Amino acid sequence: MPHSDLPFRALGVLHSARFLFNKYGFHNVGVDRIIESANTTKATFYNYFHSKERLIEMSLTFQKDGLKHEVISIIHVQKELTVIEKLRKIYYLHADLDGLYHLPFKAIFEIAKTHPKAYQSVVDYRNWLINEIYNLLLTTNSNASKQDAHMFLFVIDGAMVQLLDPNKPDERKRLLEYFLLGFG
């Protein structure tokens, strides 16, 4: 069921779960805590989501769909931007603890073994993003490779890891500039 077709109560549960998963992690948040936070009943929860695993899948799909929409907009709609400007926007869209990518990034480390179907949606998104970045790089550099697109994603992931450490300075700009040196 598409998110736009979910009733208000189900959307409330979905948003509460996304917030709690982002803040505390997938393993530290149980169904009872989500139900309490969403101010709903167990019957409502199980009617729409059937299980915590299904809720995790839907939460990640919600984030993934939002990210895809933004990336497509940056690459294909915002024609006035240069490739470097588009890469910058995509980078900062992802390298943000308050952004849509934080939950899928967290899922990489927390749910691979316990929720393989939900984890696969994150893998699918990352592969999609690599292809989009690769095609974007090809528009100005015919020698661009898939490895360049992979490296861009690794730079995003590195920035996220640094942001998660409160004792490290925010070096997102420096990481991105280092990557862009090869394309500027």
What does each model-identified segment do?
Residues 8-17, 34, 59-63, 67, ...:
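Generic hydrophobic, amphipathic alpha-helix propensity
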Residues 58, 72-99, 152:
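Hydrophobic alpha-helical connector segments
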Residues 65-69, 97-100, 115-140, 146-150, ...:
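Amphipathic alpha-helical packing segments from all-alpha helical-bundle domains
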Residues 12, 20-54, 58:
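Helix-turn-helix
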Residues 106, 110, 123, 138-181:
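Hydrophobic/aromatic-rich alpha-helical bundle segments in the mid-to-C-terminal region
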Residues 16-20, 93, 155:
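Short amphipathic alpha-helical elements of helix-turn-helix/winged-helix folds
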Residues 1-8:
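N-terminal intrinsically disordered/low-complexity leader segments
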Residues 76, 90-98, 106-114, 178-182:
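Helix-loop "lid/cap" segments that line or gate small-molecule binding pockets
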